[in-house]
Amino acid sequence: MSSWSRQRPKSPGGIQPHVSRTLFLLLLLAASAWGVTLSPKDCQVFRSDHGSSISCQPPAEIPGYLPADTVHLAVEFFNLTHLPANLLQGASKLQELHLSSNGLESLSPEFLRPVPQLRVLDLTRNALTGLPPGLFQASATLDTLVLKENQLEVLEVSWLHGLKALGHLDLSGNRLRKLPPGLLANFTLLRTLDLGENQLETLPPDLLRGPLQLERLHLEGNKLQVLGKDLLLPQPDLRYLFLNGNKLARVAAGAFQGLRQLDMLDLSNNSLASVPEGLWASLGQPNWDMRDGFDISGNPWICDQNLSDLYRWLQAQKDKMFSQNDTRCAGPEAVKGQTLLAVAKSQ
């Protein structure tokens, strides 16, 4: 562990396939415990046989060059609208790049070309309204792209061209109102898609056609009113589905058809008064047990005979039900305020 300034180059070493950010921060903490002191204008550096990991935060200066063996770089919490054009020059072994909380408004199309081995790009909490086409032309190995909490109102398919190995895409906390058709068509390796906390009212029917093994889908905190029967059909391996905090008033019959490996379903805080018979039939059947549970609280359930199918399902799955005391009937008057589970038991 040492300080590093732009006047002190370092000879390259080996490469670690993936240096986790958590491990990096732990190493920095350990170095502090050992009494290592750093100049306030220098970035923090951890050097090992696997390469250099560098963290820069104010009042440190943004580096003018990087050691050739850099595998991890964090430049965060600076008041920047643009990055230095040559920031990544000479760092061809870089695998993780964290640029969160900088106020970035745009990126150059050539920005990532010097780092063809990049696997993680974190752009959380910036001011990006778009990405330049061609940004990812040299990013065939990128696995994780985080664009959380920017100012994206639209997405263009062309922005993501070149991403062949993408496994995790986080677009949460933006201002997205709609998505283009074919957005994920080429992302066959995608495992996690996070579209939570946007302003989406509808989703393109082909949204999930492309990924072959999607495991996590975050759609919470949007304005969705209807869940169609075909949206989830291409993803039989889906394990976590978050639809909470929308305006869902209707879930189509068959919407969950084939989701036999689902571990977690969150439908809480929507506008559901009823659901079609047979909706729950495939969930947890025949050999899966919804091991991480489900939540249907915060909906205005009308607890009449139209929920008989749901009553039966709840009786079988009650041990996995979250927020049981907050899952209550909004009507009819005779059962208003009672828990849905209590009504189910009385049937």
Curated annotation (Swiss-Prot):
- UniProt repeat feature LRR, residue ranges: 93-114, 117-138, 141-162, 165-186, 189-210, 213-234, 237-258, 261-282
Q: Does the keyword Disulfide bond apply?
A: yes
Native organism taxonomy: Eukaryota, Metazoa, Chordata, Craniata, Vertebrata
One Pfam family it belongs to: LRR_1
Q: Which PROSITE patterns match?
A: LRR (PS51450)
Record-given protein name: Leucine-rich alpha-2-glycoprotein
- According to its record, what are the GO cellular component terms? extracellular exosome; extracellular region; extracellular space; ficolin-1-rich granule lumen; intracellular membrane-bounded organelle; membrane; specific granule lumen; tertiary granule lumen
S-S bridge residues: C43-C56, C303-C329
Report the domain of life of the source organism: Eukaryota
Question: Would you list which residues are glycosylated?
Answer: T37, N79, N186, N269, N325
Against SMART domains, the record matches this protein to: LRR_TYP, LRRCT
Q: Where in the cell is it found?
A: Secreted
Coiled-coil intervals: none
- Which GO terms fall under biological process for this protein? brown fat cell differentiation; immune response; keratinocyte migration; leukocyte adhesion to vascular endothelial cell; positive regulation of angiogenesis; positive regulation of endothelial cell proliferation; positive regulation of epithelial cell proliferation involved in wound healing; positive regulation of epithelial to mesenchymal transition
Does Disulfide bond show up as a keyword for this record? yes
Limits of the LRRCT domain: 299-347
Q: Which range is the signal sequence, renumbered to this chain?
A: 1-35
What InterPro entries is this protein classified in? Cys-rich_flank_reg_C, Leu-rich_rpt, Leu-rich_rpt_typical-subtyp, LRFN, LRR_dom_sf
Which organs or tissues contain this protein? Plasma.
| Site note Not glycosylated, residues | N306
Organism this protein belongs to: Homo sapiens (Human)
The record's keywords, sorted A to Z, are: Disulfide bond, Glycoprotein, Leucine-rich repeat, Repeat, Secreted, Signal
Q: Name one GO molecular function term.
A: type I transforming growth factor beta receptor binding
